[in-house]
């Protein structure tokens, strides 16, 4: 567990960072849902449905060691979280010997704690974990608000495209 002090406008916060566990699946799910709601990504019923499927998925990924997450707490309140998904990946010209890629997801900070460097701290935790595992390529999808944070950390815009099959099964 890591503790650090953050001084903002004469306010001292005693924050604690810890690794996410299976017990945090509900919190991670709530933060993910709030992250998408903040970005107006989808209507509430769609986010509810996503959350219903996400929680058992993230439990499984944590149990299998494929999702490594961190939680920041202020006293007894969990205020921020993020995760690193470990993906099997084909060797690529960006990393010709690597067989894994990292994907940072669920970076969320409660509104009253934003603009204090917490998203950056969580992203750094994810990047450090990727380095410990020898993962050299890490991707993420950034909101408009988050993009400057990630660019400051060295992320660049890529040419990745996305296709979503919207036909009903």
PLM regions and their residue ranges:
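A short beta-loop-alpha structural element at the N-terminal edge
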Residues: 16-30
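Conserved acetyl-CoA-binding loop of GNAT-fold acetyltransferases
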Residues: 24, 135, 151-161
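Conserved GNAT-fold acetyl-CoA-binding loop/helix
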Residues: 36-58
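A short helix-loop-beta-strand connector motif used in the catalytic cores of GNAT acetyltransferases and
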Residues: 56-71, 103
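Conserved beta-strand in the GNAT
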Residues: 71, 77-86, 103, 108
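Conserved acetyl-CoA pyrophosphate-binding loop and the N-cap/start of the following alpha-helix
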Residues: 113, 117-125
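Conserved GNAT acetyl-CoA-binding A-motif
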Residues: 123, 130-142
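Conserved beta-strand-loop-alpha-helix junction that forms the acyl-donor binding cleft
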Residues: 138-149, 163-166
């Amino acid at each position: 567990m890591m503790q650090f002090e953050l001084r903002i406008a004469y306010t001292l916060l005693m924050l604690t960072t810890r690794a996410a566990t299976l017990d945090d699946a509900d919190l991670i799910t709530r933060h993910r849902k709030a992250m998408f709601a903040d970005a107006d990504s989808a209507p509430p019923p769609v986010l509810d449905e996503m959350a219903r499927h996400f929680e058992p998925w993230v439990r499984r990924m944590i149990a299998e060691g494929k999702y490594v997450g961190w939680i920041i707490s202020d006293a007894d309140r969990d205020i921020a979280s993020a995760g690193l998904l470990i993906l099997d990946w084909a060797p690529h010209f960006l990393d010709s010997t690597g067989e894994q890629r990292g994907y940072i997801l669920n970076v969320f900070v409660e509104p009253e704690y934003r603009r204090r460097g917490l998203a950056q701290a969580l992203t750094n935790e994810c990047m450090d974990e990727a380095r410990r595992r020898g993962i050299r390529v890490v991707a993420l999808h950034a909101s408009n608000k988050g993009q400057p944070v990630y660019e400051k950390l060295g992320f660049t815009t890529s040419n990745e495209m996305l296709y979503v099959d919207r036909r009903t099964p």
